[in-house]
């Protein structure tokens, strides 16, 4: 191994960390670790001041390697969107009729976020966090809507399980 940073391997590692945080009652790391690693992953996806993802980065200086070769710029097979949806926003895929959300955003990081118009089990899903209640005007907290109807609410960020709503 030459030490280079590979976006796909980073995605796999972050997915594993998200799964660990979602499946362990008392994890030895916190959502803050996941969030910081996601920040670093996002920050790495620039080249010459523009959004870019390639095959791999130099581990010491963060520069994209092979960036001027044609094959590198078509190398986006990371799972970035999945990390945002299932990790940060916290939609936890399930086969049953239960909707489970567990955002891995530390409570002191974002005042609001919204994932909207997601087709999930044939239903239209919205997940939103509004710390103060003044962004989306639906009240404070974490809310889950299915087909426009609220099916779950929590005052704080954390696991929210909504049984038999799908």
Model segments located where?
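Non-catalytic carbohydrate-binding regions of carbohydrate-active enzymes
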Residues: 1-123, 133
């Amino acid at each position: 191994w030459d030490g280079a940073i590979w976006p796909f391997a980073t995605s796999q590692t972050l997915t594993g960390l998200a799964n660990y945080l979602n499946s362990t009652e008392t994890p030895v790391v916190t959502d803050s670790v996941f969030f910081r690693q996601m920040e670093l992953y996002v920050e790495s996806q620039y080249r010459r001041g523009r959004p870019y993802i390639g095959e791999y980065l130099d581990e010491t200086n963060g520069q994209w390697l092979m960036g001027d070769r044609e094959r590198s710029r078509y190398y986006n097979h990371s799972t970035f969107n999945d990390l945002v949806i299932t990790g940060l926003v916290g939609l936890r895929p399930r086969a049953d009729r239960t909707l489970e959300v567990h955002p891995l955003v530390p409570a002191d990081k974002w005042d609001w976020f919204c994932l909207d118009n997601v087709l999930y089990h044939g239903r239209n899903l919205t997940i939103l966090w509004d710390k103060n209640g003044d962004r989306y005007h639906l009240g404070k907290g974490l809310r889950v809507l299915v087909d426009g109807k609220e099916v779950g609410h929590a005052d704080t960020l954390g696991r929210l399980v909504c049984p038999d709503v799908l």
